[in-house]
């Protein structure tokens, strides 16, 4: 039996993690975000009602679940308050269900200004960030000048620290990027207005998780973005600024690494990517348009159209290695309904003609890579909403089996629609 279960993306994000976390938290006592910020976009559909969460863990809709934002998350006070208000307007008592680590770095207005100024300065070489200040906030954390939630307990000292760090960043904004400075007093006033709300939710997360482990409570760790966007293991520099892999759980929450019991990798039945960066199986034809339209592939956070392509088992195998995956959840299988044939990338052909079955690390090394495909028959029958494996077409079952063979990991959950009920749980992670 696994008490501590990690749910993370195995591709470039947007795999459908939010729905699965929401589904599995029916048995959990706690749900923990351990990295990223409000650049995530987790969409839940419950009884036909759609909820998009960016910062608050997906377990917040569950009455008996406590949601926790761990120290690995960069926290925007304004984004958090906006999301809390939207949920409270729907009658969800967020403040009774949400806890924060005092070590969460804060994202403030100058981080957003820096993020956007840098992307503009990069021009054609822009990374494609969400423009929400995530990267600059992590930079401040590593440079040891960042402000954290815990700093808000001493408001006078916070004001002094804020002034010092803003002088540093405003100098850069004005003199290097040639944009307006960010107003110190406005930033201070905005944060002070909600400081007591934030500090009122602070808890020692590491100790809480250790006590939960000793009691045998079920805990879900919710990843954001995807493995191939990891700052170390992704397609650098076209990556996010945090560790999106299973290793980020320990550093981003304070859970001891030996206590992770099961790692569930969410894998979309095809591939998507938002923003710039390598994407060997990207499709520019009518099939790519079909996947985008049928899958409604537009970012929950930015609204940007996602790039689409065939499933890449080479990249997925890298995710298996890095995360020591216990099992997969296959999502959006129904999007492939109606295609005469489906393809899976099984290897890459390098510019010099070599065939390889592992991914490069640096983005430049991906240039000129050609995907080598295995083609399989598609299916005309609908898989949408199917809740039993026996109800799936034979061709769809063969597709599932081939993914398992190529990756060496069992598919324990199959999602056939956006609602939490449109799911087959073949093996429950908490029982594995």
Curated annotation (Swiss-Prot):
Q: Which residues take part in binding Mg(2+)?
A: 14, 41
- Where, by residue number, does GTP bind? 13-19, 41-43, 306, 332-334, 415-417
Question: Which cellular components does GO assign to this protein?
Answer: cytoplasm
According to the record, cofactor stoichiometry and binding are noted as: Binds 1 Mg(2+) ion per subunit.
UniProt keyword annotation of GTP-binding present: yes
Cellular compartments annotated:
Cytoplasm
The reaction(s) annotated as catalysed by this protein in its Swiss-Prot or TrEMBL entry are: IMP + L-aspartate + GTP = N(6)-(1,2-dicarboxyethyl)-AMP + GDP + phosphate + 2 H(+)
Active site, renumbered: 14, 42
Q: Which cofactor does it need?
A: Mg(2+)
Q: Is Ribonucleoprotein one of the keywords UniProt gives this record?
A: no
Q: Which residues bind IMP?
A: 14-17, 39-42, 130, 144, 225, 240, 304
The metabolic or biological pathway listed in the UniProt record of this protein is:
Purine metabolism; AMP biosynthesis via de novo pathway; AMP from IMP: step 1/2
Q: What does this protein do?
A: Plays an important role in the de novo pathway of purine nucleotide biosynthesis. Catalyzes the first committed step in the biosynthesis of AMP from IMP.
Q: What family does the entry list?
A: Belongs to the adenylosuccinate synthetase family.
Q: What is this protein called?
A: Adenylosuccinate synthetase
């Amino acid at each position: 039996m696994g008490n501590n279960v990690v749910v993370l993306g195995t591709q470039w994000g947007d795999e459908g993690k939010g729905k699965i976390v929401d589904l599995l938290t029916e048995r959990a006592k706690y749900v923990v975000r351990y990295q990223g910020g409000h650049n995530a976009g987790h969409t839940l559909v419950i009884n036909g009602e759609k909820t998009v969460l960016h910062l608050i863990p997906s377990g917040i809709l569950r009455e008996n679940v406590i949601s926790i934002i761990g120290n690995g998350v960069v926290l925007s006070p304004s984004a958090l308050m906006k999301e809390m208000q939207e949920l409270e307007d729907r009658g969800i008592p967020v403040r009774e269900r949400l806890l924060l680590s005092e070590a969460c770095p804060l994202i403030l207005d100058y981080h957003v200004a820096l993020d956007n100024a840098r992307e503009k300065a990069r021009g054609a070489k822009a990374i494609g960030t969400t423009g929400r200040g995530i990267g600059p906030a992590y930079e401040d954390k590593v440079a040891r000048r960042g402000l954290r939630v815990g700093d808000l307990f001493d408001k006078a000292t916070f004001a002094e620290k804020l002034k010092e760090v803003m002088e540093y960043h405003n100098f850069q904004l004005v003199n290097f990027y040639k944009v307006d400075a960010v107003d110190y007093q406005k930033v201070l006033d905005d944060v002070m207005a909600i400081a007591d709300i934030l500090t009122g939710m602070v808890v020692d997360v590491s100790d809480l998780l250790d006590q939960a482990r000793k009691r045998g409570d079920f805990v879900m760790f919710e990843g954001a973005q995807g493995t191939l966007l990891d700052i170390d293991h992704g397609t650098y520099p076209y990556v996010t600024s945090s560790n999106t892999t299973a290793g980020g759980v320990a550093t981003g929450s304070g859970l001891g690494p030996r206590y992770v019991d099961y790692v569930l990798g969410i894998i979309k039945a095809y591939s998507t990517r938002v923003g710039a960066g390598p994407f060997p199986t990207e499709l520019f034809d009518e099939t790519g348009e079909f996947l985008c339209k049928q899958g409604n592939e537009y970012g929950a956070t930015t609204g940007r159209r996602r790039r689409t392509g065939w499933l890449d088992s080479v990249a997925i195998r890298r995710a298996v290695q890095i995360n020591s995956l216990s099992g997969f959840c296959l999502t959006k299988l129904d999007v492939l309904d109606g295609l005469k044939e489906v393809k899976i990338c099984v290897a890459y052909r390098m510019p010099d003609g070599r065939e390889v079955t592992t991914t490069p690390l640096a983005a430049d090394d991906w240039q000129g890579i050609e995907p080598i495909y295995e083609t399989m028959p598609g299916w005309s029958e609908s898989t949408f909403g199917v809740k039993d494996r026996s109800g799936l077409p034979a061709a769809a079952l063969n597709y599932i089996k081939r993914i398992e063979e190529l990756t060496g990991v069992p598919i324990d959950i199959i999602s056939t629609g956006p609602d939490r009920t449109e799911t087959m749980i073949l093996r429950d992670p908490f029982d594995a």
